Amino acid sequence: LYSQLAALARRYGAKRLVLFGSRARGDNRYNSDIDLAVYGMPEGSRSNFWMDCEDLPTLLKFDIVHITDGMNPAFLANIEKDGVTLYAAKD
């Protein structure tokens, strides 16, 4: 599943895709959602990315956050602290 998410991030032009929350920390329950932080994805691609994520073969829900300037620094620090990078574009 994570490799499919990375492929979607690449397809839709994200600079970085990070898994965060309980699944990244390893304290998730079987039905915990999948928290994703998306960096640098063009605005016009975001809804298609979300729809394609929802079409992946899982019953789990996705909570997708597109990282933008001006977001809460504490929230961003938590993502960086616990996050697992699933995709990073090569510059």
Regions inferred by a protein language model and the residue ranges of each:
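Catalytic core of pol beta-like nucleotidyltransferases
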Residues: L1-R16, A24-Y30, Y39-D91
